[in-house]
C-alpha cells in the first residue's frame, strides 16, 4: 500500500469529524487482537484506512453505512509462509480462492519457481501478484538449487539475493534449508543471514527435528523462525529459544493438532499460522489459513488468539506496517463473520473495498516449451510443444 499524505490527512479529518468517512460499520463485535477481547463498537473507514473505532462513532457521517447487527469483525488473515506454486494456479486464481474466505495477505517463498526460472521467475511472480485484492509479500529463496546434487534451471547466489532484497515487497530471505551448513558455520549460508539483516528484513528458518545444541547453534546464526516442528516438545523448545514458531497445516504435512497446546495467550506474538503447501483440492474444500483458524478453535484454542496468530502475529514478525489488526491507522482489511467459532466469511473488505475486485492476469514471462505425453490411453505417446497463445498442444 503506497500511502500518500492525502490518505493520512483524510483519515485524521474523518476521525476528528471534519470530513465524512467512506464507510461506517455499525454495531460490530470486533475481535481485538491486542487485548484478545470482543468489543461491541463501531468502525469508521477513510478510504483504504481505518480512521476510528469506538462507541462514539455510532452516528458518524459516512458515504455508506452498514449495520452489522452484532456480527463479528476480524482482521484479514495473513498466511505467514506459503509456496504459491503448490496451488498449481496463477496468483490471481489463488487470490480468487482465498480472499472470499477472509485471507487478505500471504508471504510466499517462490522456491520451485526460482529453481526453474531463477531471478526472471521471481520477477514474473512480482508482476503477476501486483494489483490483486490479495497482498503478496515475497521471501527470496535461499536454496537454489536445493542441494549441490541437483541440476536446477538457475542458481541464486549472494549477489542475486542482495538484488532481490531491495524490492519493496520482499520481506526476508526464505527458509535456510541447509541447516548442516549453518551448523558448520558455512560462510555462504551465514552471508545470506547477514544480507537479510542488513536490509532490515527477516532471515527465515527450516529446522526439522532440531533441539538441544543443534537448535542453539542454528538460532545463534540469527535465523528468526521455523515452520518444521512436528511435536509439542520440539515446538516448545523452539519457543523457549526465542524462535518465532510457525504452526503448519498443509496438504501433506499437518502439525496443527500436535502443536495446538502452544497456541496460548501467554505466548504472545511468538506464534503464527502457515499453510506451507496446499493443493487446489484442499484449498477448494478446506480453504487457506482460514482453515487453520477454524481447526485451531475446534481444538480448543481461544478464538481471539487463533485469529491473532493468523493475522497480527504474522504482521509483527515481518514488520508489515498497518496490517493485521483493526485499529485507527491500520489498513482496512476486515472479515465479517456470522459466527466466530466457524470463521466463515460473510463479507470481506480489502483496503476498505468489498467486492468488485480486479483479477489481472499478466502474460507469461516467456513462451516456454513443455514436453508431455499425449493423454490418450490407447495410443502411442507423442511429444508435443505447448503453445500458450492457443492453450493446447500443437
Region annotations inferred by a language model:
Residues 2-14, 92-202, 266:
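Divalent-metal coordination cores built from histidine and acidic residues
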Residues 83-85, 111-113, 141-146, 176-179, ...:
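Active-site beta-loop-alpha junctions enriched in small/polar residues
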